[in-house]
Amino acid sequence: MAKQIKAQGLFLGTLLLLISNIIVKGLGFFYRVALVRLLGAEGIGLVEMVSPLFSFLIVLAGCGVQPALSQLIAGRGEAERQLYFRAAFFILLLGGSLVTLAALAFSPLLLRHFISDSRAALCFHTILPAIPIISIASAWRGCFQGMRRVSALGVSQNAEQAVRVAVGLWLTARLLAAGLETAVAAASVATVCGELAGLLCLVWQMRHSGIRPLATSHTAGELLPAVRRLLAYGLPMTAGRLIASAILMLQAFLIPYCLSRAGWDTRAVTEIYGRFSGVALSLLHLPGVFTAALTVSVLPAVAESMQDISSGRMLLQKRIHDSLQAAMVFTLPGMLLLWLYSDPLCTVLFDNAPAAIILRWLAPGGIFFYLQVTLASVLQGLGAVRTLLLNSILSGIILLFGIFWLTSQPTLGILGTALALDISWLTGFLLHLNACRRLTQIRLNWRDIAGKPLLATGVSLFIYHLAQPLLVQSILSPAAARLALCCLICGTYLLTLLISGGLHRLHR
């Protein structure tokens, strides 16, 4: 490539993506709140029924090339980067085009078997053009990630989200009068526009940096070995992601089916599913702003440490330790606040009080969800894609069995789904942790990773229960009292971490 780009370190890269993800998550959360208020729980339920099938098609089109490209170009020279990028670009262009055409051709079959409400058909058809756009963009994302230029990823995410939110809100508001199905399709159109904006932003940044990854031509003899290496790494990864996406797709079909078995009608089922996926899970994913940034930086960092024979083991241990500790430090207070403030969050933001109890059941398991995501990135960096595949299969089977058994119980309903997710996340975390220990033979300091954050969480909860009666009975309004308690929890948590030394190792 034309210029030598300086890589950004693990902590710096995470910090840059953290800032970007705060903006992206903030915009996305605002967008979700507005959509729920515009479309209602029933409308957002239709959107969420399409999302797992769309995600499955995206993974199928991507062939696992983005993480493969990221790992293969990490620490390599410019000539090899150009070669792998060009090979990845053509794989993704072909994959995205073929999957989109196949989805259009077989859409009646897909809708009949994987989406329980026929009103979501228009939403599904209008989102399909995003598939080739996302596929092509993943080549640039994998290249930037492998070079550890994560700031470029952050800029493109911001552009993508800003366009999606602006187009989505404007178009949904204008199409509400045309009916719920048409208004729901506006969210799909907004997704297509946002992904296109993100792709254009990535291309512009690459050209602005003086990099021309497609400028140098390569012969078929040069490209074929690169294609084979990309697919050799990416296809097992695709299998794992396809299984994860297939599980989400089956989950989106199985939950409404089990709720129907438990006695709810079609409209009630769609509304309940909207509360679960559109409200409760949206809030649960909000604290993931940090872990999302962390996982993007961890994969190439772990891959690079594996290449350094002399100091690789110590560096690998430190990076795995730091990533787990950082995930724990940021996840615990987030889950605590969601558990304590589920009622006001669901009522004030979404005007959907019934979703609060679902969120309370999901919050404890959310801790293991975020740790599982972090460990999955570590395993990707180690190249243990087959292990990830087996772990995904096992935890997915447990999830689907739990949903089928628990959600069908009239006394549990959608709460059974939440419990099944908690069990599945715990299982996935334990499987990933065991795999990391087995593959790396390193020892982790769980006193720093979990002990100190748990201590800080316990102290914060104790202070909360002491202060709550005093603040509630004071002259403060209920909203002001809740805000004061929230600040008190965060302040106590941070202070306890500082005193116990729970933050001193997070310096990179």
Model-derived regions, located:
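Alpha-helical transmembrane segments of multi-pass membrane transport and lipid-handling proteins
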Residues: 89-113, 170, 317-368, 400-401
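Alpha-helical transmembrane segments of multi-pass membrane proteins
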Residues: 116-139, 336, 340, 351-375, ...
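Membrane-interface helix-loop junctions in multi-pass transport and translocation proteins
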Residues: 151-152, 162-201, 205, 386, ...
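Membrane-interface junctions at transmembrane-helix termini in multi-pass inner-membrane proteins
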Residues: 134-156, 364-394
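Hydrophobic transmembrane helix module of multi-pass membrane transport proteins
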Residues: 96-242, 246
